Swiss-Prot record:
Membrane topology: Multi-pass membrane protein
Family from the record: Belongs to the major facilitator superfamily.
Gene, per the UniProt record: mamH
Note: This bacteria makes up to 20 cubo-octahedral magnetosomes of about 45 nm in diameter which contain membrane-bound crystals of magnetite (Fe(3)O(4)). Expression of just the minimal mamAB gene cluster (amb0961 to amb0978), including this gene, is sufficient to form a minimal magnetosome chain with small magnetite particles.
GO MF term (any one): transmembrane transporter activity
Cited PANTHER family: MRH DOMAIN-CONTAINING PROTEIN-RELATED (PTHR23524:SF1), TRANSPORTER, PUTATIVE (AFU_ORTHOLOGUE AFUA_8G04850)-RELATED (PTHR23524)
Compartments where found: Magnetosome membrane
Induction and repression of expression: First gene of the probable 18 gene mamAB operon.
Protein name (database record): Magnetosome protein MamH
Membrane-crossing segments per the record: 21-41, 57-77, 86-106, 107-127, 156-176, 178-198, 243-263, 274-294, 302-321, 358-378, 380-400
Summary of the knockout phenotype: No visible phenotype, magnetic response is slightly reduced and magnetosome membrane formation is wild-type. Deletion of genes mamH to mamV (amb0961 to amb0978) gives cells with no magnetosomes and no magnetic response.
Source organism of the structure: Paramagnetospirillum magneticum (strain ATCC 700264 / AMB-1) (Magnetospirillum magneticum)
UniProt entry keywords in alphabetical sequence: Biomineralization, Ion transport, Iron, Iron transport, Magnetosome, Membrane, Transmembrane, Transmembrane helix, Transport
SUPFAM superfamilies documented for this protein: MFS general substrate transporter
Transmembrane listed as a keyword: yes
Length: 431
């Protein structure tokens, strides 16, 4: 290898490592914001148990509605001007919202005003983070080819899972020692670090699109023509909401059940954090297994198995009354092991069939579908949490996962009957 080739290889490794680290930082930010929210609303803004599910769900839905509008456009814009500038700007915007959030009681004054300010801060944070993580996924696709895609995107997913694990296993212990405000301000520091790292080490490598507006028609034609892409989009509709469900409603369940058994709020949050941290660790550790599974058996098979495992775990949660009972570990482990496959395989399928100059736009549409799923499932879940009971949202989303499992099985049977395989197309096939 010549000196020039060695230098180029070193730069490539540095870019990949920066992508992995940024994936972790982005998930630390996004997860910590959601995890600290029930604790902040309960102990700082004094939101009552009776309205907890609706208020927490509404905050999440407001942010997802915003994401719904920005994902598609920013995906297209990244195809036009590059992804790195959008990532840097997104981290900076997220940092602004992260500074405002803990100050909402002082900025807003009365309880209703403080809640409005907090809503605004969450919208700002969502706009920022919504500009970051889809572009990181697109960069992982840009940096890969058919031979390296499963490995590179699995490594990126591994680091995202590591970020989630770090939040619930370590960072969610901070409120009990340093306070809620300090923990919330930590998200601003994480965002600023991400902006610096992205600007310093990431580069754009994808070709620029010549489209002058969001190419909805081209994306729709792709999805309509390719059944596997339809499965990927359908999986996004259900699977993206799953992780939000666990992060939001499980934390809610612990915090508000704590009042019934006379356990402190911070202790309950820490207990839930440990459990969700365990889930994140299982997701993280199982991703290499899923990468091997995808390489040996195929993307569709991974979606099918992942959805079945997650569905079993979610439905089992419906039989639990006390979340502090350690039996809850079993369904959480099933959800975690299934979610790792559901997180990686649909994204790989999407990148497989997206033209290189429209990858950002196709992933933008993929994420829009995920937002619709989150809005629907979180809104319904908040209603079920308040009026049916804390386990109800989990059973509801488990049924949704079973529906996608049935669709994936049908697709596999049809491909087996028609003699189709599960190989990814070459770049020429999607250009």
């Amino acid at each position: 290898m010549s000196r020039v080739e060695a230098a180029a290889a070193e730069v490539k490794v540095r870019q990949h490592n920066a992508l992995y680290l940024l994936s972790a930082l982005c998930m630390v930010f996004m997860t910590l914001v959601v995890a600290i929210q029930p604790l902040f609303l309960r102990n700082v803004l004094n939101i009552s148990f009776e309205t907890a599910g609706a208020v927490n769900a509404n905050v999440q839905v407001v942010t997802e509605v915003l994401d719904l509008f920005i994902f598609a456009y920013l995906g297209y814009l990244s195809d036009r001007i590059g992804r790195v500038r959008i990532i840097v700007a997104g981290f900076l915007v997220a940092a602004i919202g992260a500074v405002i959030a803990p100050l909402s009681p002082w900025i807003g004054g009365a309880s209703i005003g403080a809640l409005v300010v907090y809503y605004v801060s969450r919208v700002i944070m969502s706009a920022g983070s919504g500009a970051v993580w889809p572009q990181l996924s697109a960069l992982a696709g840009d940096f890969s080819d058919d031979d390296t895609r499963a490995r590179l995107m699995s490594n990126t997913a591994f680091m995202m899972a590591f970020g989630v694990t770090l939040v619930y296993a370590v960072l969610m212990q901070i409120p009990a020692h340093a306070g809620i405000a300090v923990t919330m301000l930590l998200t601003a520091a994480v965002s600023l670090a991400g902006a610096w790292l992205a600007g310093k080490f990431l580069v754009d490598v994808a070709p620029r699109t010549q489209e002058t507006s969001v190419p909805w028609r081209a994306v729709w034609s792709l999805v309509k023509a390719e059944p596997r892409l339809r499965l990927a989009f359908a999986s996004s509709l259900f699977a993206r909401s799953d992780m939000v469900f666990v992060g939001l409603f499980l934390m809610l369940w612990f915090i508000y059940f704590a009042d019934l058994i006379k356990v402190g709020q911070a202790e309950a949050a820490a207990r839930a954090g440990i459990l969700i941290g365990l889930m994140g660790a299982v997701v993280m550790l199982s991703i290499p297994v899923w990468r091997s599974f995808i390489e040996h058996f195929g993307r569709i098979q991974a979606v099918l198995l992942g959805m079945v495992l997650s569905a079993l775990g979610f439905i089992m949660l419906g039989f639990i009354i006390n979340p502090f009972d350690w039996f809850i570990v079993l369904p959480i482990l099933l959800i975690a092991s299934g979610q790792a496959g559901c997180f990686v395989a649909p994204q790989i399928l999407t990148v497989d069939y997206a033209p290189r100059d429209l990858l950002g736009s196709v992933l933008g549409a993929f994420n829009v579908i995920g937002c619709i799923g989150i809005i629907f499932f979180v809104q319904v879940g908040g209603f079920l949490f308040d009026y049916v009971g804390p386990p109800a949202p989990f059973v509801f989303t488990g049924v949704g996962n079973l529906i996608i499992s049935a669709y994936a099985l049908r697709l596999l049977k049809r491909e087996a009957r028609d003699g189709g395989g599960d190989d990814a197309p070459g770049d020429d096939g999607v250009a």
